[in-house]
Amino acid sequence: MEKIKVKEIFNNVYSVDFGDGLKRIATKSLIPGKRVYGEKLVYSDNIEYRVWNPNKSKLGAAIINGLKKMPIKKGTKVLYLGASAGTTPSHVADIAENSLVYALEFAPRIMREFIDSCNERKNLIPVLGDANRPQDYSNIVEKVDVIFEDVAQPNQAEILVKNAKWFLKENGYAMISIKARSVDVTKNPREIFAEQKKILIEGGFEIVDEVNIEPFEKDHMMMVGIWKGN
C-alpha cells in the first residue's frame, strides 16, 4: 500500500491523488484487505480505500466524467439491476455502509461469481431474477431510495419505470446506464438517448443529470432522474 492524498467529492466517494496527474476515485473499504475485482488498495490516515476502476464500472466512469447528482450515499437503500459479478455493487455497498443494497442478476453462473466475490459484504443482498419481472422478487425487495440500472436490453428505460412503480419511494432517485447499441444498432446513439429519455419522462421521472461516459464505454449515457410517479 502507498500514501495518497484523499478528498471527499460526494458522500463516501473520494478523489485520490497519487501525484501523477491522473484522475482517480475510491471508496472506503467496507471489508479491509478484501479485493473484489483485483482493484488497488491504498490508505490515508490509517483508512483503507479501494480504487474504483472506471474501465470496469459505468458509475465510476460517470463520476470521473463529471456526474453532478450522486444520490447514493451513507444510509441509502438501493436496488441494483444488473449486478453482474459485483464490481460496481461492491463500491455502492461501501458508500451505503450499513444500508441494504439489493443486487439483482439474471444469469445463475454470474450470480455464483457475485456471491463468491461479495459474500463478506453483509449489506449486499443477492437476488436472482429477471428485471423485466419485478413482481417475481417483490417478496424480497423493500421500498428503496435509489434504483441503479445497468441492463443491456432493448427496453432499458421501460424496465426502470416498471421497477420504480414497484420499489422506488416517491421523490426517490434512479440512475440508468443507457447502452445505445443494445436498444438499436442501426440508429444514431443520440437519437436513442433522446428516445430513452422521453420514455423515462413519460413514465414518471424528472431527469436531473446526464453524463456521456466515453471513452470508458462507447455509446453509453448515464441519466439520473427523480421519481414523481404517474
UniProtKB/Swiss-Prot annotation:
Entry keyword Nucleotide-binding: no
UniProt-listed CDD domains: AdoMet_MTases (cd02440)
Intrachain S-S bonds: none
Function: Involved in pre-rRNA and tRNA processing. Utilizes the methyl donor S-adenosyl-L-methionine to catalyze the site-specific 2'-hydroxyl methylation of ribose moieties in rRNA and tRNA. Site specificity is provided by a guide RNA that base pairs with the substrate. Methylation occurs at a characteristic distance from the sequence involved in base pairing with the guide RNA.
GO biological process: box C/D sno(s)RNA 3'-end processing; tRNA processing
Protein's name according to its UniProt entry: Fibrillarin-like rRNA/tRNA 2'-O-methyltransferase
Entry keyword tRNA-binding: no
Protein species of origin: Methanococcus maripaludis (strain C5 / ATCC BAA-1333)
Protein's gene: flpA
InterPro entries linked: Fibrillarin (IPR000692), Fibrillarin_CS (IPR020813), SAM-dependent_MTases_sf (IPR029063)
Enzyme class: transferase
Record note on quaternary structure: Interacts with nop5. Component of box C/D small ribonucleoprotein (sRNP) particles that contain rpl7ae, FlpA and nop5, plus a guide RNA.
Chain residues that bind S-adenosyl-L-methionine: T87, T88, E105, F106, D130, A131, D150, V151, A152, Q153
Domain of life: Archaea
This enzyme's EC code(s): 2.1.1.-
Alphabetized SMART domains for the sequence: Fibrillarin (SM01206)
Biological classification of the source: Archaea, Methanobacteriati, Methanobacteriota, Methanomada group, Methanococci
A UniProt-annotated Pfam family: Fibrillarin
HAMAP family xref list: RNA_methyltransf_FlpA
Keywords: Methyltransferase, RNA-binding, rRNA processing, Transferase, tRNA processing
Leader sequence segment: none
Family: Belongs to the methyltransferase superfamily. Fibrillarin family.
